[in-house]
Every structure is written in structure tokens, then in C-alpha cells.
């Protein structure tokens, strides 16, 4: 019944975020523009991306979370799942919420990957707008009761993923980044 997950998410649920491996093939129109407009070289390293070439950082393979998430579903009361793809947090998280529900995402509760800091700097994209374009280091979110959050995170970490509580579902609308 997870397909109708939006009907299960409740005010008070938390969102556990699973770290992304990078851009995950979304937002590449902007990426190409940033690279082109700034004369960036895919074969060069930049301080923002910590010793990797820009090409390596941009082409980091997309994480696939199926096995890990199935383990969480088997052991926790999952109310909703959202893959953070094109449209970032703003378009993807609301898909699992009912009307009248929103989230306040706690920036700093996960690592924003260096490649996003580079794109923000050179692309002169507003920080808040970055969350509307990119995954910003979160590839997927799982909505579940707060009492299941620690267990879900432990399962994900046992599978080699980085995960953390990003937000709580609140009364309201949309996604707020705090």
C-alpha cells in the first residue's frame, strides 16, 4: 500500500534523509551552463570539490536505494517515500504530503556535498533556489513515526548509507529550509 503513501503521512512524522552520491543526473542543463559560462574545466580540480576533478564529481554514479529501503519497510512503519530528483526538495517532498501538511527541513542535519557548493558559487544561484533545483546531498527521504527514526537510520547505516533526520511534518504547506 506504499503507492498511496501520501495518505499515510501524519503531522508529527519525521523525514529521514538518505545521502546522495552527487548530482544524480538532475539539473544538468544548469550544470552545463555553469561550466560553460565560467570556463570551468572538467579535467581540473577545484578547492570546493576537495581534490577530485570537476568531471569526476559531476559523473559520480547515482545511488540506488532499493535494497536498503526494502529493509527499512520490512522493519519500520514507513508512511511515505520520496526520491529527490529534478525539482529538488520543493517538488518532490510535497508529493508524499496531504493538503495542509508541510515540512521544515533543518539545514545542517546532513552534509551538503561539495559539488553543490561549487555550482552555487560559480552559477551565482541563490542558496534557497539550489534546493529547488538539486538534491543538495539527499537522494531520498522516508516519512515515518519519530519512534521508528533511529531504527531506520541504523538499518540504513548497516547497509553502508549515511542517513539522518531532516525534518518533521507540520501543519502548513510546502517546504521551508531553516
Task: List each language-model region with its residue ranges.
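Phosphate/diphosphate-binding glycine-rich loops and adjacent basic-rich segments that engage nucleotide
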Residues: 1-47
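Glycine-/charge-enriched secondary-structure boundary and capping motifs
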Residues: 41-42, 47-178
Amino acid at each position: 500500500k506504499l503507492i498511496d503513501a501520501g495518505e499515510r503521512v501524519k503531522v508529527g512524522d519525521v523525514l529521514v534523509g538518505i545521502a546522495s552520491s552527487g548530482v544524480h543526473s538532475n539539473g544538468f542543463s544548469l550544470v552545463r551552463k555553469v561550466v560553460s559560462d565560467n570556463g570551468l574545466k572538467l579535467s581540473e580540480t577545484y578547492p570546493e570539490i576537495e581534490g577530485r576533478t570537476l568531471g569526476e564529481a559531476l559523473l559520480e554514479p547515482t545511488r540506488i536505494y532499493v535494497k536498503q529501503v526494502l529493509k527499512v519497510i520490512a522493519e519500520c512503519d514507513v508512511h511515505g517515500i520520496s526520491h529527490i530528483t529534478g525539482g529538488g526538495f520543493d517538488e518532490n517532498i510535497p508529493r508524499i504530503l496531504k493538503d495542509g501538511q508541510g515540512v521544515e527541513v533543518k539545514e545542517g542535519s546532513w552534509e551538503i556535498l561539495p559539488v553543490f557548493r561549487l555550482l552555487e558559487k560559480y552559477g551565482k544561484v541563490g542558496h534557497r533556489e539550489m534546493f529547488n533545483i538539486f538534491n543538495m546531498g539527499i537522494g531520498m527521504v522516508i516519512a515515518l513515526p519519530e519512534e521508528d527514526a533511529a531504527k531506520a537510520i541504523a538499518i540504513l547505516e548497516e547497509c553502508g548509507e549515511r542517513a539522518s533526520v531532516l525534518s518533521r511534518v507540520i501543519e502548513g504547506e510546502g517546504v521551508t529550509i531553516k
